[in-house]
Structure formats: C-alpha cells, structure tokens
Amino acid sequence: MKQKRRKRISLYILVFIAGLTLCSSVNILPVTNTHAGYSIFLSNYPFPSFQSISYSPEFNLNSDSVVIPLKRAGRLFLIEAKIDGQIGNLVFDTGANGLVLNSTYFRNYTKTGGTISTGITGNIGPVEQIAVRKIEFSGILYKNLKADLVNLGHIENHRGVKILGLIGFSMMRNLEIIIDPKNSELKLIRIDKRGERVNNTDSEFKTDFTQKIEGNTNILFIRGKIAGKNLNFCFDTAAETNAISSDSNKSILSTLTIMRRSILKGAGTARSEVLFGRMNDFKIGENEIREMETIITNLDALSDVYGTKTDGMLGYNFLQQGTFCINFVKKQFGIRFSKKEEI
C-alpha cells in the first residue's frame, strides 16, 4: 500500500494541461517548429491515495433517487456541497479514486499519514489524510469519511470559484449513476445487491451501446479502438480534454491531426513537450466519434498508479457525445448518444 501511495500522480496535471492549452492566449505554432513560445505551468496537486474505499449515502425524504445539478466552471463540472458546515463546490472528478479536500479550508483538522507524491516531472509534495463528519448535497448525506488533504488553490485561482475538494465514483459506486452533461445533471438511483433499482417508478435508461466494466476499483476504464487497435481509456469527468499515450503504436498516432505544441512545466525544474490535436479514428463498439480534442503525452505514471495499462483518457469532449449510465454492481457502462445537431 505504501508503495502504491508513493506512486501517486496528478490527474490535474493532465486536466490543467488541457485547460491552459485551450486558453485564447496560446500561440498556435506549426508542428515543425522545435521551440514552443508558450509554457504550460502545472499545479502541485498530488493524486489521491489508491484505495478501494466506497461510501453509501443516506437519502433524505425517503427518496430512492436524486437529481444533482452540475454547475460549470469552464470545462469542469461542480457540485454545490456542505462539508462539516463549510459551503462550497466539489469538482466531479471520476479520475480521482478517493475523496480529496482542499487544505485551504480543512487545515485545522487532525492529520494522519504523509507520503511523497509523484507527478509527471518528479516528486511534488506530501499528502496527509483527515476525517470529516459529514458531507451534504442535493438531499443526500454521507457520514464519517476519510479524505486526502491537498492544496487545491490552483483550481480556485484558475476558475475563480470556491473549491472544497474533488468527488468521484467512490461516493456513488453502490448506486446507479446517470451523467447528463447536456442538461448539466447527475442522477443517483438506489439499487439492491444485484444492481436492480429498488423502486421501478423511474423509467429504465435506454442505451445505444453497452460495455462490461472490468476490474473492481473506483476508476472506470472503457475499451475503445483507434486504427483498429483495442485501447484502454480512463473515463475522467474532470479531464478538460482527452489524452493519448505518446507510447502508442505509430499506426494509432498517425490517425491524429496535430495542431500545435506546448512546453509542459511541472512543479520541479523538468520540462517536456506536449502535442495538442484531434482524434480522427476513435470508435467505441461500432460507433465512430471523430474530431475530439486530445493531448499526446506520456501516461506511464498513470498506468503505474492505476495498476493497469492506460492508453488514454476520455474527458470533456467525450462527455459531450451523449448521456452515460454506470452500474458498478451489474458491471455495466452504457451510452445514449446525442443527435449530431445536439452536440
């Protein structure tokens, strides 16, 4: 466990590569240029501990489902929440394995643990753990949770909103999850031990495509294809763009349209080059999705911390393709695609 905790990596390194790359101040450079005139500066955000803890909420008013409004901050989805009386926003981040809270607001809590976190460009700082009494949002309540405590000030500064922390599938994997980006809604539905809805009054979610979920962690991986080759993608609602591993087969990389390059600068002194472009040959099942934005970068550290080979990440552009239903108990992932005019 300690070794896995030392292999933490920042998903927000990838998230904010995308966000900053997309800023209007970026100079579009020809790919043949060997020196980019724009540097991407990364945060000190460490990846949360790789633990398999999950929590089940209490539903108020004896309800069997809840619809949670998702606010937008750029390409991030936010949930308004109250944590031990503190009101603010949680980033909906399915790439985070556990609950992560902002040290700005929870620094006075009793801390345990303390390991060195690793980012793409090297060690970037320690992570401590705290316990919180309760988290409330949209009529549901969680009690007695553990959370990693890190500095998330860079997200607040970048987006101009109060960020209490990050929340992912660990808080909802015992429920049926419906993510509707178009209508900015997250719906959670009570299910039994077999994954069936406890109340059938809600209409069943109809999918255009269904895929079996592999593994048993709080991180969701989706199988897709590029250039006819099967690839393993992390489904990440907080990734502001997609990502493809720079170690991918040449036949895969050749399908990408490279638009520009930027310099990736981490918390340390090391730098690396990141390419930004579009995916032209992505398929999930027999469904082709073209021209999604992506970055091309090394994902070896991400594979290490997840314990599985990670060929890419599917983020904001993928989420715009439809409505998603996830049932970890049944091990089912489904998509109902939006009509082309709706995307």
What do the PLM-derived regions correspond to, one by one?
Residues 2-343:
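Pepsin/retropepsin-fold aspartyl endopeptidases
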